[in-house]
């Protein structure tokens, strides 16, 4: 059943269109940032829940970078998510761009989930599985969430993104230690003219080194 659910999620992402969009977000709360030096202390978390949803089964979570909002507000995307009882949370500005879990990233996310659960009345938001999505400079944060909280992470989506184990001083710091994201489904997208011809080699290398990565 989990695999069927995830197939629906990934199928939705690969087929979304930017032609028709809808910008309804029913609830929002200010974000209490637990970082020692938050870059965006004025961040706000916005929540969308399908109109006929009685109980949220999962949450698609995004921090604002560039393309995330276009994906989240796409009408066809939301129709498919509604069929799956998947909610959306969009945080703008981002609360912790790379999800540095050594600097309060999880505590911040956990807090806003609890606040939105209280505000909306959908109590399950505080415990529901999370599908993290990030684009470009924020493309690695889903993997960092998965590494820190694998028990809460249903899947990771990296748009124009990175491979999970790629490291960079600024965007993908080496803070995982012995953590891994084995058995957590991940989807990385890269355009044909967007370094795909070389970046695919890195993906093949990581799959070989981490055979339990779906």
Question: How does the language model describe each region?
Answer:
Residues 155-214:
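The feature captures the conserved acid-bearing segment of alpha/beta-hydrolase catalytic domains
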Residues 18-59, 104, 128-157, 163, ...:
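A domain-start/cap signature at the N-terminus of enzymes
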Residues 64-66, 135, 142, 146-147, ...:
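Cell-envelope and extracellular/periplasmic
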């Amino acid at each position: 059943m989990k695999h069927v659910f995830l197939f629906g999620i990934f199928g939705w992402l690969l087929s979304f269109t930017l032609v028709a969009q809808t910008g309804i977000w029913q609830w929002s709360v200010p974000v209490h940032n637990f970082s020692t030096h938050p870059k965006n202390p004025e961040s706000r978390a916005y929540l969308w829940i399908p109109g006929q949803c009685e109980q949220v089964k999962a949450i698609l979570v995004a921090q604002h970078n560039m393309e995330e909002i276009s994906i989240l507000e796409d009408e066809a995307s939301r129709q498919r998510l509604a069929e799956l009882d998947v909610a959306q949370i969009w945080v703008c500005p981002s609360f912790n761009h790379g999800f540095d879990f050594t600097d309060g990233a999880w505590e911040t996310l956990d807090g806003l989930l609890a606040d939105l659960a209280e505000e909306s009345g959908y109590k399950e938001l505080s415990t529901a599985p999370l599908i993290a999505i990030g684009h470009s400079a924020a493309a690695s944060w889903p993997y960092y969430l998965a590494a820190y909280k694998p028990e809460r992470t249903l899947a990771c989506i990296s748009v124009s993104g990175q491979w999970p184990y790629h490291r960079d001083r600024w965007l993908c710091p080496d803070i995982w230690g012995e953590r891994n994201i084995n058995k957590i489904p991940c989807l990385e997208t890269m355009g044909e003219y967007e370094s795909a011809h070389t970046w695919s080699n890195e993906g093949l290398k990581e799959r070989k080194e981490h055979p339990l990565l779906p």
